[in-house]
Design a protein with these regions (language model features):
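Short glycine/proline-enriched coil/turn segments at helix->beta-strand junctions
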Residues: 25-26, 53-57, 102-104
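Conserved alpha/beta-hydrolase
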Residues: 49-76
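Short amphipathic alpha-helical segments
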Residues: 20, 44-45, 72
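A short, mixed-charge helix-start or loop-turn motif at secondary-structure junctions
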Residues: 34, 75-82
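Short beta-strand element of the alpha/beta-hydrolase
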Residues: 26-35
Length: 105
């Protein structure tokens, strides 16, 4: 079963993350980053994460300005989405990877 957590990502920005714990001995840690206009709970992402967690620790997350807020299934943050940039997404990834390096799963 996955568990959710949040990481601050700057002023009025949050990374909403899900951890899928490995179901045995972890071979590795996999971070799944959705593409443009995607989000972690959309389409196949939850199913892929669950399947990979049979042998790996898996983290999925929403970029802070992807348009998905507290309602994890609907596009509700249009103003943030309008301000999204590749630089912002790289910064989000740095924040997540830094957190994971300091808090091993």
């Amino acid at each position: 079963m996955n568990s959710n957590f949040e990481l601050p990502a700057g002023e009025d920005a949050v990374l909403r993350c899900s951890r899928y714990p490995v179901q045995g001995k972890a071979k590795s840690l996999i971070v799944i980053a959705h593409g443009y206009k995607g989000f972690k709970d959309w389409g196949l992402f939850p199913y892929v994460a669950a399947a990979l967690s049979r042998e790996h620790e898996v983290i999925t997350f929403n970029f802070s300005h992807a348009g998905i807020g507290e309602d994890l299934l609907n596009f509700t943050e249009l103003e943030k989405f309008a301000r999204n940039t590749y630089h912002r997404e790289l910064k989000d990834m740095e924040i997540l990877l830094s957190y994971l390096s300091q808090h091993p799963t």
